[in-house]
Every structure is written in C-alpha cells, then in structure tokens.
C-alpha cells in the first residue's frame, strides 16, 4: 500500500485546516511535492519510506473516503475529546469556567443533505448534536458529537435532539466522570428531563427560558418577579479591559417548577433588559432598548452581580452558533455533502471539528504573537498564507527539534 492509514486521515484533516471546503479543492493540488512531503511528515510515514522512483503525491479524496467508509469515527471522536481534555487538565481553559464549572454549550446542526440513493424516495438530511466548551473570548471547542436520527419534519428533528441529548450526556459523563460541567442551551432544552439529568450528574445548567416552550412556568416566574420587588438590580456587563459597565436592569426569582406537584424540578429564573447607549453626531448619548430575555438555572442567585453573570454566560450560547456559521461559510464545508456513505460522512464531520478546534487554539495562542503589526489581517488571509507556505515551502523542520516552550506558554 502506497499510503499509511495515518497519511490518509491527515490528508483529509489538513484539507479542512486549509479551508478546502470541497473534495475537488482538496484534490486540486495533490501533485504538489511540498504539500505531499508535509502530509507525510505530519502523519509520521516519512519521506524516506516513499518508494524510489515514485512521484510524491497527496492521497486523493476517493482514497481516504474509501478508508473511512469502513469506520473510524470512535477513534477520531476520541482524538477530539482528548484534545479538549488535555487543555482542561493543563489548566489552559480556566477562562471557560463559571464558578468552578466548565461551561459546555449544546446545540443541534444540520450536517448535510446527502445525495439521494437509488431506490430512496427523498434525500436523507443528517443532523448532529454538538457539545462545545465555550469561553468569553469567543472560543467554542467541539468536545463531543452525538448523531441525531434523521426525520423529515422540523418537529421530528426537535424531538430527536432531546433523545440525542440524553445519549450524549451519558457519553460526556463517561469521558469526564469527575469534571463539574455547566450545560448551556436554548429554550428547547429548558425542560424537566434535562434538568433532572443535570441534578443526577451534579451538573449546573443555564438554559434560555421562553414562554412558548413552557407557558405555565413562564407565567409563574413572571408573576413571582412582579411580587418580589426586592430581587432586582442593575445589569452589569464587562466592557473594554474587563471594566464593569451598568447596562440595564436584571431581576430574579426562585422556586419555579414546570408542574404544580412538589416533586417537580425547582429552578431559578433570571430576567434581563439591556439598555444600549449610543452617541449621536452632536455628542449627546441616547439609550436604546437592547437584548431582553430570561434564563433558567440551578445556580444560587443572591444578588444582581451573580444574576448578571448568569445572563452573560447564557448569552454566550451564541458562541456555538457562531462556530457553526464559520464552519458553514468560512471554508470548512459544513452542510456540503462530501460523501453519501454515512460512515465516511460521520468521520469527515469529526475531522472537520478537529480541524476547527486546532485552528481556534492556533488563532488564540499563536497568531496574536505572530501578527504583531498586522492586526487588521483577518483569519482568511492567514489561512491563505498557510496554504501558500505548504505549497511553496512545506514542513522542513524535524518535530523533535521544535522548542517545547512555545507550547507550554500558550494560554487561552
């Protein structure tokens, strides 16, 4: 066999890192000797093991898809999870903790619409449920992926997201048995079964709380806030240089349940109303209404500062939405059908998540030091520089000779 299995996997992974969002783009430069040598060095196959007289090439997409059709998703998933576990163990993700709990956002995403196979009435739409560690700096590192069983209707998809969540949290718990986790999600997950799971595992939760999801509990929380006039205060947000800025009002209440029965799950609700200050052309300041929302949580809320922190972390659920947007429109190819085979498709999706994780760490830890004096360069420009470097220069240094101090000093 010309290529090792590691080389085949690295060909796909490097394609995602270099934002090649289709298989044709991955294959367009496969005859480049510098790129081929880089892939061989990354995979550990080594150029010296290449057959004499054979031209250096990168594996084509059909070759690595042929390998991934036989499976490999558990091994790739383990690599994704181990990367995040390593960062947590080395205390590089302390910024992703709220009161000691690592904050994990959960949300479903449409992976792709697969090509309609022969004999099928319609094309299969594939969904995934993502668990991503989020942080105030915009970080959203994929930690675990659970497959959502396909349904044709949107309501069926939502039902399956909850079923996938129950499967996913068990596996996250198995991967991180002693890690305190705070689950952040949208209003779909603000229900008694999810809260009961968090209680059984000793986890915390901050979930978007909307009237349409639980009208009775929403009305109970709103009435309780109107009665408890003392449980309100100023909404405090972090401005530039982490300065505290008064930005609206916040209120909270406790003892809210989805059912009138005593055995129902009791939780706290925090509501906020943000006021945005804008400067007019004449220099005067005006206040405009900003974000308004409510969050269900099992954190103890005692004052307006704690309530403001709950609101801030609840709103950071948008980190995972932003990461999906980057994967869709930033060159990764999310929602693009790479392969009709579901095993290969799942493996490629996990490699995409691993590539995005690697890029986020690189962007947060390495680029700020390299980009001094080039602060206006976007990520797309840096990807283009990397792409040209791989094609023109490649990887020349021996990995064993790289100084470890650069890795130790990385801090998210």
Model-flagged regions — what are they?
Residues 7-10, 291, 319, 323, ...:
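Catalytic-loop motifs flanking and including active-site residues across diverse enzymes
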Residues 204-319:
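An anionic, glycine-rich sequence signature occurring as long contiguous blocks
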Residues 230-257, 329-412:
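A short, flexible helix-boundary coil/loop motif
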Residues 1-8, 121-122, 285-287, 337-349:
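Structural motif
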Residues 27-28, 324-330:
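Short coil/turn segments at secondary-structure boundaries
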Residues 15-19, 71, 299, 314-317, ...:
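Generic structural signal for hydrophobic core residues of well-folded globular domains
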Residues 158-162, 307, 347, 351:
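Short, charged, low-complexity patches
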Residues 1-206:
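Conserved, well-structured functional cores that handle cations and Mg-NTP chemistry
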């Amino acid at each position: 066999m010309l290529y090792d299995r590691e080389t085949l996997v690295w060909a796909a992974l490097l394609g995602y890192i270099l934002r090649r969002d289709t298989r044709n783009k991955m294959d367009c430069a496969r005859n480049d000797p510098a790129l081929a040598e880089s892939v061989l060095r990354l995979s550990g196959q080594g150029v010296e093991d290449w057959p004499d007289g054979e031209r250096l090439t990168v594996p084509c997409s059909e070759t690595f898809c042929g390998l991934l059709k036989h499976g490999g998703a558990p091994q790739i998933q383990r690599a994704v999870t181990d990367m995040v576990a390593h960062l947590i163990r080395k205390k590089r993700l302390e910024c992703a903790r709220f009161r000691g709990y690592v904050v994990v956002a959960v949300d479903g995403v449409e992976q792709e619409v697969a090509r309609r196979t022969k004999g099928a009435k319609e094309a299969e739409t594939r969904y995934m449920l993502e668990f991503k560690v989020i942080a105030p700096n915009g970080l959203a590192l994929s930690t675990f992926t659970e497959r959502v069983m396909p349904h044709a209707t949107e309501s069926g998809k939502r039902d399956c997201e909850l079923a996938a969540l129950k499967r996913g949290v068990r596996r996250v718990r198995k991967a991180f048995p002693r890690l305190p986790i705070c689950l952040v999600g949208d209003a779909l997950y603000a229900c008694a079964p999810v809260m009961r799971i968090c209680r059984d595992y000793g986890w915390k939760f901050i979930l978007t709380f909307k009237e349409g999801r639980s009208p009775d509990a929403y009305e109970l929380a709103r009435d309780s806030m109107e009665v408890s006039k003392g449980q309100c205060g100023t909404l405090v947000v972090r401005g530039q240089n982490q300065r505290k800025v008064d930005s609206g009002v916040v209120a909270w209440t406790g003892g809210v349940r989805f059912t009138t029965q005593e055995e129902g799950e009791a939780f706290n609700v925090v509501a906020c109303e943000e006021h945005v200050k804008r400067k007019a052309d004449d220099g005067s300041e005006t206040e405009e209404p900003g974000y308004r929302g409510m969050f269900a949580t099992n954190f103890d809320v005692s004052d307006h500062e704690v309530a403001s922190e709950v609101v801030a972390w609840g709103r950071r659920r948008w980190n995972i939405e932003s990461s999906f947007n980057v994967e869709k429109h930033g060159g990764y190819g999310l929602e693009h059908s790479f392969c009709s085979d579901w095993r290969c498709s799942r493996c490629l999706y996990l490699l995409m998540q691993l590539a995005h994780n690697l890029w986020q760490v690189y962007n947060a830890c390495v680029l700020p030091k390299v980009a001094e004096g080039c602060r206006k360069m976007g990520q797309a420009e840096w990807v283009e520089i990397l792409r040209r470097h791989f094609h023109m220069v490649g990887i020349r240094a021996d990995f064993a000779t790289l100084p470890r101090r650069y890795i130790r000093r990385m801090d998210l």
